[in-house]
């Protein structure tokens, strides 16, 4: 089981690092590259650089709120 945990941890770390690298390059470096350069076809338009994290944050906060609400409802049922 320890080997599987390490593999999952390595996979999650690799995914996180690749997303961070992609987003950093997209937001910080790409605006300084000419718009007709071939590298632009690998990235979404700059508008999405703000929209994607905002919607991801809203979705995360919504899921956390639903989870907390369900836990609170279950704890009320146990007390009653």
UniProtKB/Swiss-Prot annotation:
Q: How does it sit in the membrane?
A: Multi-pass membrane protein
Position of the signal peptide: none
Q: Which GO terms describe its molecular function?
A: enzyme regulator activity
Q: Which InterPro entries match?
A: DPM2 (IPR009914)
Knockout mutant characteristics: No visible phenotype under normal growth conditions.
**Protein name as annotated:** Dolichol-phosphate mannose synthase subunit 2
What phylogenetic lineage does the species belong to?
A: Eukaryota, Viridiplantae, Streptophyta, Embryophyta, Tracheophyta
Q: Which residues form a coiled coil?
A: none
Complex and partners: Component of the dolichol-phosphate mannose (DPM) synthase complex composed of DPMS1, DPMS2 and DPMS3; in the complex interacts directly with DPMS3. Associates with the GPI-GlcNAc transferase (GPI-GnT) complex.
GO-annotated biological processes: dolichol phosphate mannose biosynthetic process; protein glycosylation
Q: List the Pfam families hit by this protein, alphabetically.
A: DPM2 (PF07297)
Q: Name one GO cellular component term.
A: endoplasmic reticulum
Q: Encoded by which gene? A: DPMS2
* Pathway(s) the chain acts in: Protein modification; protein glycosylation
Which locations, inside or outside the cell, does it occupy?
Answer: Endoplasmic reticulum membrane
What role does this protein play? Regulates the biosynthesis of dolichol phosphate-mannose. Regulatory subunit of the dolichol-phosphate mannose (DPM) synthase complex; essential for the ER localization and stable expression of DPMS1.
